């Protein structure tokens, strides 16, 4: 009984048969023996070294994975004849022979399987030809002739599965044919033709082999030409070698073996006295099986007809020039002729064009090719290579083409002694030829000197890589390697131009680096050894802190006192550099303050009457930090000399008279005198009085305190202020102090006594009245506070000043103490009657947001109204008023939440902003996690989110555009996160929540409060310093939130762990659904050094280009083991 096995095993079987086409392996079936008990199969390996202990043994077995029969009556057994031959015996009945047999030989990657298909001699249908080898794209025709006719349909199967059915009347000349058009390699396999309802033992079994390329082609892509295999050889589609039929050998199967011999080198002998008669030879694919050379027929026992030769007698001799046909070898040519048909005349071989001089690098193992032509064609063994020392090398590979034979020689490792003349020799029966060529062995270059340091900065080294070298040129490349001193990390390397200096960038400040050079010359193995190493040290780090000018005071026409400040962070610097630029004259004055703790300096020797631009910057070693915002200072013109002979006289307890003389030789007419008054020993600021009548040289100073000592000095003004006079000291009268003048003394005493009495009475009454008024005012304020909030709010502005807010008809007046003048800030006014409150959108501890319909400029629109609760704290009022100030100053932008207007009603402030119908971005992202909300939808559509990759990237791009606008307006957000981004119409994202924003370049937080730690930059965590660059860090976290669909940053880590690990270089890992380019942008935002983070303009540009690329930068497909990023609401509150 025969039945088909599982077709699932076929790929393993047939793929294995394609491995190692050049393996010398033959499977023989002795068809002369018809008795199953005497039948045997033999597998022979002709591989050199076959049977070594390390190689797997030859295997020969019946392969019932394809065609199965009942197990034989007794087990089959193997008989081994040495290590290279094995025989299978033990068959008991004819059905044991039907099916597929396989022989496996070779080792490692060359392990090869050879197949043989045996048909029953008594079958109903018998194949005209068992093995068919065709090319990819050809038409294959399988033909079975009728051996025992049945009037039933014929079923065709492929690898055991139904393939086609033919009506029994479709037989043509007693044959059933299956035509397969445009066959492909998967079409290979075992085919069978069987009468319907007949025993499978009566089937005709075929084997179809489809080469992986078209006719005459081989290799990957089938772009290489086959060598033109002769005498029925088949070109292997993997390596292009010819698989020769039994009885032939050679690169192109051009040589015939002696009668009765087979194998790749004709080394095997057919058994018995009958020679190869009755034997079927099966070879590695793509050859298949055939009779031996000179035999044909189903049992390979029929000799070839006259004029035919070769395996299965498929070849015709067609001999020319007196040649005779031999059924085993083909045409036997007379002397002077050769070729398949004796069509080629013998001639002396000739070596073709060859380079006269070649160059190799020492230690390499080159391949040298030598091509020759002639009749007969040069073959392997007829071409040799002679070295200068007389050593002869044999070719390792021969490529035969229609007009030439090319031999390839593998040369052992070259030494300098191999330099000299080499010779290629060829010898055939037609003669011999040779050709000499010169080989130059070169030594790769090695630097003799270490690279030189030309310049250095904190993060850069400028290096001259090459001075001199040993060995041979020319220099094709210079590879510079560098790494930190005493470090074990891998060397960093760059390839540079040997004629140019090299700048090593992105180094660590104040760090030693070992720098060395490797040179290369052209050709394989041209890399030389390392040259001497040089130690180079980078400069000190640049100061990162930016000072700001607090004040400057002109103390004279050529003297200027300057004060500045720094953020309260650890100072790394050696001092300060003050720069004054005189633009009119194109001159610069620099003042070096070498004391890093200094915060003030007196600049002298300046040019009077000059406009200066002033800035200050921190320096460290020789490097300058960022300059402060510049200030413009005007020095007055040079003034007159000091007034002369100033003296003072007390007139009473509140009056002192000053007298002086005009300055000598003033520079022009005096316009006025200036008197300076200051309490002696006091800490208060001095006061000044102008004497507008320049002809007067005295003045009575009134309103002074009794019994108080004062200091006075005077200076004149022409076009500029002059020098101060000498300082005089005088005290007012009182408590026994009398005037020096005898006449005015009594008068002054009486007047002083009267005035003291009057002042005492008036002071007592005034104090009583003020006390009563204060009590009444306090009662009124308390009562009004209970009824409603007052209309004045105080908050701390970004500049540190206390600010009072007052509302008056659309003007927000910011009165900043101690400045006496208010600073009005206008905002669009909404009337209370034009606001219709609707639903509560959100609520916090001290504030709430209500959706409302407002009427503005005659149009109704949706708005979000923000307001404080009744018991909000002073800090909440401060932040709320500050947010209105920010919104007013920012203006309009499509990617920020814009101000619609504000309204004051009964002491409450109401701010109307744009309404975002989709809420905040964080909730919007989390709601899109469709695998959690609707798993059936997610699996049906294969997506993890209702949002596309492009929409997520659009959120990030919009947010970057909004932050670019904020940074250009010099506003620091300080709380950028997905919860503070709103989703508006058309799913546009808008930056919101400006309660913590600051309109400054640098802000140092001095107050306590809850901090968004997981979104904060390192410098903000450690030093409470906020800049636009710290907003860039927060944007990187926001980008991570978008990609992770609202995951909690650093989920599973505490704030304390973040404080510890972020400075050590820890960063969030790349989300699995995130493209490398997007994650690289996050990493750029999270760089340690703020100045290395990209500006928002660059971020917005990069995200815009990603949108234009239309690439899926965020993968929302449900890939294997997909999980969402974790969410920890408790951690987000910290």
From Swiss-Prot:
The chain crosses the membrane at residues 756-780. Residues 835-1114 form the Protein kinase domain. Residues 1-22 form the signal peptide. Pfam families: fn3 (PF00041), ig (PF00047), PK_Tyr_Ser-Thr (PF07714). ATP binds at residues 841-849, 866. Disulfide bonds join 226-235, 229-242, 244-253, 266-276, 270-289, 291-300, 313-325, 319-331, 333-342. Residues 23-755 are extracellular. Phosphorylated on tyrosine residues in response to ANGPT1, most likely by TEK/TIE2. It is found in: Cell membrane. It comes from the Eukaryota. Residues 781-1134 are cytoplasmic. It is an enzyme of class 2 (transferase). The modification Phosphotyrosine is found at residue 1003. Residues 212-254, 256-301, 303-343 form the EGF-like domain. It is a single-pass type I membrane protein. It catalyses: L-tyrosyl-[protein] + ATP = O-phospho-L-tyrosyl-[protein] + ADP + H(+). Residues 444-543, 546-638, 642-736 form the Fibronectin type-III domain. GO terms for biological process: angiogenesis; aortic valve morphogenesis; blood vessel development; branching involved in lymph vessel morphogenesis; in utero embryonic development; lymphatic endothelial cell differentiation; negative regulation of angiogenesis; negative regulation of cell migration. PANTHER family: TYROSINE-PROTEIN KINASE RECEPTOR (PTHR24416), TYROSINE-PROTEIN KINASE RECEPTOR TIE-1 (PTHR24416:SF341). This is Tyrosine-protein kinase receptor Tie-1. It comes from Mus musculus. The lineage of its organism: Eukaryota, Metazoa, Chordata, Craniata, Vertebrata.
């Amino acid at each position: 009984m025969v039945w088909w096995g599982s077709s699932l095993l076929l790929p393993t079987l047939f793929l294995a048969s394609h491995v190692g086409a050049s393996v010398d392996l033959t499977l023989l079936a002795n068809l002369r023996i018809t008795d199953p008990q005497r039948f045997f199969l033999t597998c022979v390996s002709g591989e050199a070294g076959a049977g070594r202990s390390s190689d797997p043994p030859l295997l020969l077995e019946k392969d019932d994975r394809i065609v199965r029969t009942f197990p034989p009556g007794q087990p089959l057994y193997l008989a081994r004849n040495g290590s290279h031959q094995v025989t299978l015996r033990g068959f008991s009945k004819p059905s044991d022979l039907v099916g597929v047999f396989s022989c496996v030989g070779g080792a490692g990657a060359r392990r090869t399987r050879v197949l043989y298909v045996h048909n029953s001699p008594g079958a109903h249908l018998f194949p005209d030809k068992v093995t068919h080898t065709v090319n990819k794209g050809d038409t294959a025709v399988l033909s079975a002739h009728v051996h025992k006719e049945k009037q039933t349909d014929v079923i065709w199967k492929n690898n055991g599965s139904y393939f086609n059915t033919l009506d029994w009347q479709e037989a043509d000349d007693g044959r059933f044919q299956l035509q397969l058009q445009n066959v492909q390699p998967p079409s290979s396999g075992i085919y069978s033709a069987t009468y319907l309802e007949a025993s499978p033992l009566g089937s005709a079994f075929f084997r179809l082999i489809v080469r992986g390329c078209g006719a005459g082609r081989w290799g990957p892509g089938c772009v290489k030409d086959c060598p033109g295999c002769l005498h029925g050889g088949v070109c292997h589609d993997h390596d292009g070698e010819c698989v020769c039929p039994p009885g032939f050998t050679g690169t192109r199967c051009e040589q015939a073996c002696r009668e009765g011999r087979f194998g790749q080198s004709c080394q095997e002998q057919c058994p018995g006295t009958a020679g190869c008669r009755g034997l079927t030879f099966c070879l590695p694919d793509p050859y298949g099986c055939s009779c031996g050379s000179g035999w044909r027929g189903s049992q390979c026992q029929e000799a070839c007809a006259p004029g035919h030769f070769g395996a299965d007698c498929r070849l015709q001799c067609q001999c020319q020039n007196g040649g005779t046909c031999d059924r085993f070898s083909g045409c036997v040519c007379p002397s002077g002729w050769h070729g398949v048909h004796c069509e080629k005349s013998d001639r002396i071989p000739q070596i073709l064009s060859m380079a006269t001089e070649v160059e190799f690098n020492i230690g390499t193992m080159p391949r040298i090719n030598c091509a020759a032509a002639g009749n007969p064609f040069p073959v392997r063994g007829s071409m040799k290579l002679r070295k200068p020392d007389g050593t002869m090398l044999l070719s390792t590979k021969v490529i035969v083409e229609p007009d030439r034979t090319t031999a390839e020689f593998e040369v052992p490792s070259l030494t300098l002694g191999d330099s000299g003349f080499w010779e290629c020799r060829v010898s055939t029966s037609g003669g011999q030829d040779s050709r000499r060529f010169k080989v130059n062995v070169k030594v790769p270059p090695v630097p003799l000197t270490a690279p030189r340091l030309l310049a250095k900065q904190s993060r850069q080294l400028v290096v001259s890589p090459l001075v001199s070298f040993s060995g041979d040129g020319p220099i094709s490349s210079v590879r510079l390697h560098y790494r930190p001193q005493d470090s074990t990390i891998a060397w960093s390397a760059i390839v540079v131009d040997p004629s140019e200096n090299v700048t090593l960038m992105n180094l660590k400040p104040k760090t030693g680096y070992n720098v060395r050079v490797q040179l290369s010359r052209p050709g394989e193995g041209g890399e030389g050894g390392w040259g001497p190493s040089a130690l180079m040290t980078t400069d000190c780090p640049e100061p990162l802190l930016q000072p700001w000018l607090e004040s400057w005071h002109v103390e004279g026409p050529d003297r200027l006192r300057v004060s500045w400040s720094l953020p309260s962070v650890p100072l790394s610097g050696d001092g300060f550099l003050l720069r004054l630029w005189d633009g009119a004259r194109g001159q610069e004055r620099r003042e070096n303050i070498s004391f890093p703790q200094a915060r003030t300096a007196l600049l002298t020797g300046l040019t009077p009457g000059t406009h200066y631009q002033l800035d200050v910057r921190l320096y460290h070693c020789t490097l300058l930090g960022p300059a402060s915002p510049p200030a413009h200072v005007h020095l007055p013109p040079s003034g007159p000399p000091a007034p002369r002979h100033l003296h003072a006289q007390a007139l009473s307890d509140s009056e002192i008279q000053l007298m002086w003389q005009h300055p000598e030789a003033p520079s022009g007419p005096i316009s006025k005198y200036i008197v300076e008054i200051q309490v002696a020993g006091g800490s208060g600021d001095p006061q000044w009085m102008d004497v507008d009548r320049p002809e007067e040289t005295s003045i009575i100073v009134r309103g002074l305190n009794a019994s108080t000592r004062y200091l006075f000095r005077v200076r004149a003004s022409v076009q500029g202020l002059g020098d101060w006079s000498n300082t005089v000291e005088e005290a007012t009268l009182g408590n026994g102090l009398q005037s020096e003048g005898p006449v005015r003394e009594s008068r002054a005493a009486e007047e002083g006594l009267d005035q003291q009495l009057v002042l005492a009475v008036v002071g007592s009454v005034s104090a009583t009245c003020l006390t009563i008024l204060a009590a009444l005012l306090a009662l009124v304020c308390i009562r009004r506070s209970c009824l409603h909030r007052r209309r004045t709010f105080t908050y701390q502005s970004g500049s540190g000043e206390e600010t009072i807010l007052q509302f008056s008809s659309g003007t927000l007046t910011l009165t900043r103490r101690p400045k006496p003048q208010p600073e009005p800030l206008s905002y669009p006014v909404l009337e209370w009657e034009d606001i219709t409150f609707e639903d509560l959108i959100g609520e916090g501890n001290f504030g709430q947001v209500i959706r409302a319909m407002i009427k503005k400029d005659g149009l109704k629109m949706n708005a979000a109204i923000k307001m404080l609760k009744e018991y909000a704290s002073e800090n909440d009022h401060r932040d709320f008023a500050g947010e209105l100030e920010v919104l007013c100053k920012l203006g309009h932008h499509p990617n920020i939440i814009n101000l619609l207007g504000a309204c004051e009603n009964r002491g409450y402030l109401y701010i109307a902003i744009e309404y975002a119908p989709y809420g905040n971005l964080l909730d919007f992202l989390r709601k899109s996690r469709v695998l959690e909300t609707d798993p059936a939808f997610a699996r049906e559509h294969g997506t993890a989110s209702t949002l596309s990759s492009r929409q997520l990237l659009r959120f990030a791009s919009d947010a970057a555009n909004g932050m670019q606008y904020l940074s250009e307006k010099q506003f620091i957000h300080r709380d950028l996160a997905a919860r503070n981004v709103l989703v508006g119409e058309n799913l546009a994202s808008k930056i919101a929540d400006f309660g913590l924003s600051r309109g400054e370049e640098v802000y140092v937080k001095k107050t306590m409060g809850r901090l968004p730690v997981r979104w904060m930059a390192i410098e903000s965590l450690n030093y409470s310093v906020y800049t636009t660059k710290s907003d860039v860090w927060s944007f990187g976290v926001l980008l991570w939130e978008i990609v992770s669909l609202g995951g909690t940053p650093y989920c599973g880590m505490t704030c304390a762990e973040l404080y510890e690990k972020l400075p050590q270089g820890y960063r969030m890992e790349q989300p699995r659904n995130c493209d490398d380019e997007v994650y690289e942008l996050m990493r750029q935002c999270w760089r340690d050094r703020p100045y290395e983070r990209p500006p928002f303009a660059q971020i917005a540009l990069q995200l815009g280009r990603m949108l234009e690329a239309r690439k899926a930068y965020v993968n929302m497909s449900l890939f294997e083991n997909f999980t969402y990023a974790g969410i920890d609401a408790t951690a987000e509150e910290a």
